[in-house]
Amino acid sequence: MSIDTKAIEKHIRGILIALGDDPDREGLKETPKRVAKMYEEVFKGMEYSNDDIAEMFNKTFEEDLKESEEDNIVLVKDIEIFSHCEHHLTLMYNMTVAVAYIPNKRLIGLSKIARIADMVSRRLQLQERIGKDIAEIMEKVTASKDIAVIIKGEHGCMTSRGIKKPGALTTTMTLKGRFKNDDSLVTKLMALYKA
């Protein structure tokens, strides 16, 4: 699926008219085109399924891990992303993502983890789904069932409208495999996360 920038331009022009403004006035003439171009960039992830993203970033390194390394956690944290809430199209911002996995013969390059988080966030999203999508893609790429994703962020639908509570943070956690059932692993994960 590709993003239809011409349709976006047309509809943004209609929104400007519906708001009671003149889309042909100076300052707004190029706005529909600028918004369409911005949407093409910030919603780039909508062009790809989770399978597509997994294929994009599937370069891994095969490692012969010893049994003593079975509980070694790889954690990449403080990955900054932004997204847009699918309910109000408002910005989800000041978002940080932490992705952890226990390697199972395949190691992924650390920058690929950040790229996966970035691509998944470039969709109309829910914070909970961002975590689920990242975990699903990580499982496909690394073949590890043991994945954890922690996300913190602010939501424009809470800070700029409705209840208007700036600074309210939403935290979500997606746990798969042993992270879901092994309290000692979760304790180890949280110690790494807070370090």
Swiss-Prot record:
It is an enzyme of class 3 (hydrolase). It catalyses: GTP + H2O = 7,8-dihydroneopterin 3'-triphosphate + formate + H(+). Pathway: Cofactor biosynthesis; 7,8-dihydroneopterin triphosphate biosynthesis; 7,8-dihydroneopterin triphosphate from GTP: step 1/1. Belongs to the GTP cyclohydrolase I family. Keywords: GTP-binding, Hydrolase, Metal-binding, Nucleotide-binding, One-carbon metabolism, Zinc. This is GTP cyclohydrolase 1. Its EC number is 3.5.4.16. It comes from the Bacteria. NCBIfam families: folE, PRK09347.1-2, PRK09347.1-3. GO terms for biological process: one-carbon metabolic process; tetrahydrobiopterin biosynthetic process; tetrahydrofolate biosynthetic process.
